Structures are given as structure tokens and as C-alpha cells.
Amino acid sequence: MRPRLYIGNKRYSSWSMRPWLALRWGQIGFDEVVVPLGGEGYGSGAIPAVRAVSPTGQVPVLHVDDLVVADSLAIAEWAAERAGPGVLWPVRSDARALGRAATCEMHAGFGAIRRELSHNLGRRLARPLSDRADAELARLFDLWAGLLDRFGGPWLLGARSIADAFYTPVASRLRTYAIRAPAQLVGYVDRLLGDPDLRAWEEAALAEP
């Protein structure tokens, strides 16, 4: 059977966006199923429709025959292996290592950014940030600048990779909350936001009820 990716509402679920982009960029055919988040069990991993397909009670989750992968990064890594060498991770070992480190930092960190700049593709507003969020933004911009400088751009590791998929929702948050990236990073942010697959995701998100 074709891989089936269960995701949350496209307007809100940044964790669903990340592996969805990886699958699209890897040119891996898959079916998507949107499971609306909210209502009974929301926030506790107990939404009945999600529990029915995900052992963790969370989305995204990928089903491939009898394989069930319930984590955004694990799904992206599955996509990289399916796509083959040099597609979603670079061939250079140093680029892969630093790309995975950056991706894991996003996967596990930047908590203040995620709390204070919640993902909502239908919103546009500015708001004050805590010192912690400001410090995380500074770290984020340093990370991006360092990778772009080391590998020459135009993507973080030179060519487009899972690392870019994991930071695309952050770029959308910058736009949502009117946060201007440093001048040397504006081109990278614009590249993320101009990606055709992201635009397709956003179009579907804004059409959600």
C-alpha cells in the first residue's frame, strides 16, 4: 500500500508540516489524512481519532503496510532512506552531521519560541517576547547564518534537506508575528516561504473550516 501520513490541522500543526515537506521533497508518493485536533482529549494525547491510528496519541504518524512511525523526525529519516543518498541529506558527512544536529535542536529545543509564537497560518500580529524567546531567536539566527556561511547556501546545507523542512515552520512564525530576520538571512527566509510545497500546504490550511 502507499504510505499514509496522518496529520493535524494544517493551519496549526507545525509538527505535521515538517515530515509532510520531507516526503514531498523526497518525491515519495503518499496519501494524507487530516485528523482534526481539538475537542475531547485535546492536549492530553487522547483524541479518539488520533489514538485509533497513533500509539503515542499524537500526530504526525506514518503507516506503511504494518510499519507505524509516530514521530516527525523519525518519519523524515524514513523518507531520507526511501528517497536515497543525496536527496534529503547531503552526501558530505560533515554536512549530514551538522544538519542532523540542527534538526535535533529544533526537534527538542526552542521551547520559548514555540510557546510564545504559536503556529497559526491564518494570523498576523506583533507581540512582545520574553527575554528567553529573544535569546532563542538570537541562537536561531546564529545557527542559520553559520550553516549558510559554511556550506554556501542557498539552503542550510547547500542543497535542500530535512533541516530546512524542520525550520520552515519557524520562518512562517517570523512572518506571522512580524519578526524581521537579520539582513543576511532575509533571502533564506524568503526561500523557505516561497517553496511551492509550502505554498500548497498554506493554501490548504487557509481553506480549512
Predicted segment positions?
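GST-like fold's C-terminal all-alpha helical module
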Residues: M106-G194
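Tryptophan-centric aromatic hotspots in well-structured domains and transmembrane helices
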Residues: W15, W20, A70, W89, ...
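Short, contiguous strand/loop micro-motifs
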Residues: L5-I7, G158, R175-T176, A200-W201
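Phosphate-coordinating loops and pocket residues in cytosolic domains that bind phosphorylated ligands
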Residues: A52, G194, E203
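GST-like domain detector, emphasizing the conserved glutathione-binding G-site
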Residues: M1-L129
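Terminal-tail/helix-coil boundary detector
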Residues: E202-P209
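A generic structural-conservation signal
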Residues: E32, A183, W201-E202
